[in-house]
Structures are given as structure tokens and as C-alpha cells.
Amino acid sequence: MGTVNNAIRDSVLFTTADSIINWSRSSALWPETFGIACCAIEMISAGCARYDLDRFGVVFRPSPRQSDVMIIAGTVTRKFAPVVRRLYDQMPEPRWVIAMGTCAISGGVYNTYAVVQGSETFVPVDVHVPGCPPRPEALMHGFLLLQEKIKRSRALAGTPLDRVIAS
């Protein structure tokens, strides 16, 4: 029974449909305009004319219901983490998360009881963009890594993917 399902899943029809679906998903990433701290300034500058994320198909959206990418850019406190999780839950499937900056990845220099030590404790993070704050080029590289991850996924088979760390 398992070999028949694998043969159907790996057939030409499904792999072609997967590649078309993944191409369209990776070519139109709509991140939510959501910045918490100083990394948000670099995220804003990445959307301006000098770096122009629009050429990668990245268009910032004002609502979580219109977004498929969440960029956590900055320090998340324990009081604010449920709000971020609620915004994540309001996003339609499929959805991805980019943790931008040292504070979003590991809590940064704020090793206190009030700061969450990493965004992966309350949302699944797909791409990590390190830096304090990371340059707009690093965020662009993170989007390119996310696009490659989406292209490698199997949309119709439902295969889970590994997490990616931008270096």
C-alpha cells in the first residue's frame, strides 16, 4: 500500500503541479508590515528604492489575513509573545516566518526574565537572518533562502521541510 502511494506521489502529474504551485508561491511573498525594534528600520530600508524587494516579488501587506510571511524583527517580550502568536494564527496557510536579528533569534543581549529567548519558543521559524541589526542585504538573502525552500517543498504531498539558517 505504501509503495503505491509513493509511486502516485512521485508521478509526473504531481511533480509538475508541485513545481508550478511552488514557483507561484515563491514568486509572490507578501510579508506583514510588523516591526518591533531597531531591526524594523533595516526592514523598512530593504523595501525602499535602493534595495527594492519588489523585484523579488516581496510586497509588504498591512494585514495578517493578506500576508503569508511574518518577519519578526526585534526583541519580543513575554507579554508581547501572545500577540505575535495571535497574528501568526490569523495568517492563511501556507505561511512562513523569518526571524530577523539577534534579538528575534536568541533574545540578544537582553538575557532577562521579561524577554523571550528566541522566537522559536512560540512560532515555528523558517529562516534566521543574524545580525544586530542585519543589513538589508541580509534580509534579501533571507528571502532568497525562503524562496529556495519553498521551491524544494512538496505542495501536494504535504512533506514537512527543515528550517534554514541564513549565514
Curated annotation (Swiss-Prot):
It is found in: Cell inner membrane. One of its GO terms (cellular component) is plasma membrane. Belongs to the complex I 20 kDa subunit family. The keyword Translocase applies. Binds 1 [4Fe-4S] cluster. It catalyses: a quinone + NADH + 5 H(+)(in) = a quinol + NAD(+) + 4 H(+)(out). NCBIfam families: nuoB_fam, PRK06411.1. It is a peripheral membrane protein. NDH-1 shuttles electrons from NADH, via FMN and iron-sulfur (Fe-S) centers, to quinones in the respiratory chain. The immediate electron acceptor for the enzyme in this species is believed to be ubiquinone. Couples the redox reaction to proton translocation (for every two electrons transferred, four hydrogen ions are translocated across the cytoplasmic membrane), and thus conserves the redox energy in a proton gradient. Keywords: 4Fe-4S, Cell inner membrane, Cell membrane, Iron, Iron-sulfur, Membrane, Metal-binding, NAD, Quinone, Translocase, Transport, Ubiquinone. This is NADH-quinone oxidoreductase subunit B 2. Its EC number is 7.1.1.-. [4Fe-4S] cluster binds at C38, C39, C103, C132. NDH-1 is composed of 14 different subunits. Subunits NuoB, C, D, E, F, and G constitute the peripheral sector of the complex. Its cofactor is [4Fe-4S] cluster. One of its GO terms (molecular function) is iron ion binding. The keyword NAD applies. InterPro entries: NADH_UbQ_OxRdtase-like_20kDa, NADH_UQ_OxRdtase_20Kd_su. GO terms for biological process: aerobic respiration; electron transport coupled proton transport. PANTHER family: NADH DEHYDROGENASE, NADH DEHYDROGENASE [UBIQUINONE] IRON-SULFUR PROTEIN 7, MITOCHONDRIAL.
